[in-house]
């Protein structure tokens, strides 16, 4: 079947017609891109809109984010959650906490967000020990630990809960036959695991840098 080629012009048309980016989101994205050399770590606006839509479609009220960076995806989630919704945001560093919290304050959603600075695996294990559950878990952190994050996330969502994983295509490097980079090997293993995992329903989407949705049965 014929396929639509997404040119830069068509991509920007999609952003213009299909994404409603809150002023606080736009300001945070532009600030991150202007000030940080690693701004490519941001999710794209359409990924943020997709995340927000998943939250609303599933009526999620609790959200766990593994990897915060400057809080752009966190802000998309916070704006989509109901007023009494809760977010736990995990990051190994507080380097960008000031930028993130400023944007969250601007959007009046900071009270929804608990920011935990520690290795994500430790934090996730602690949340499991506390008996906490989340309607949606978004994984966007150290790619070399994605297998561990996925298994821990499965313990943190109830039946019907959703795990959303970013960067599953890693700029096409997942196609390499013998990758030299450990994190590429990990992503390949993860993608193979999820494809055959009877515990979840799955969908991999080729936008942004690739997103996988896994719904726990």
Predicted features and spans:
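A short alpha-helical cap/connector motif
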Residues: 1-136, 143-164, 168-217
């Amino acid at each position: 079947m014929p396929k639509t080629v997404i040119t830069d012009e068509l991509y920007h048309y999609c952003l213009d017609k299909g994404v409603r980016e809150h002023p606080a989101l736009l300001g945070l994205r532009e600030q991150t891109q202007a000030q940080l050399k690693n701004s490519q770590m941001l999710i794209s606006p359409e990924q943020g809109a997709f995340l927000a839509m998943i939250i609303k479609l599933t009526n999620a009220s609790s959200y766990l984010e593994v990897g915060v960076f400057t809080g752009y995806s966190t802000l998309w989630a916070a704006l989509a959650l109901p007023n009494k919704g809760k977010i736990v945001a995990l990051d190994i560093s507080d380097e960008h906490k000031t930028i993130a919290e400023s944007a969250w304050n601007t959007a009046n959603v900071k009270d929804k967000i608990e920011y935990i600075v520690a290795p994500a695996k430790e934090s996730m294990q602690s949340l499991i020990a506390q008996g906490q559950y989340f309607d949606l878990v978004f994984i966007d952190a150290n790619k070399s630990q994605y297998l561990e994050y996925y298994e821990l996330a499965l313990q943190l969502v109830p039946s019907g809960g959703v795990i959303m994983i970013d960067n599953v295509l890693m700029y096409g490097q997942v196609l390499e036959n013998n990758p030299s980079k450990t994190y590429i090997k990990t992503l390949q293993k993860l993608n193979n695991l999820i494809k055959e995992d009877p515990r979840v329903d799955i969908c991999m989407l080729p936008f942004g840098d690739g997103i996988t949705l896994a719904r726990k049965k």
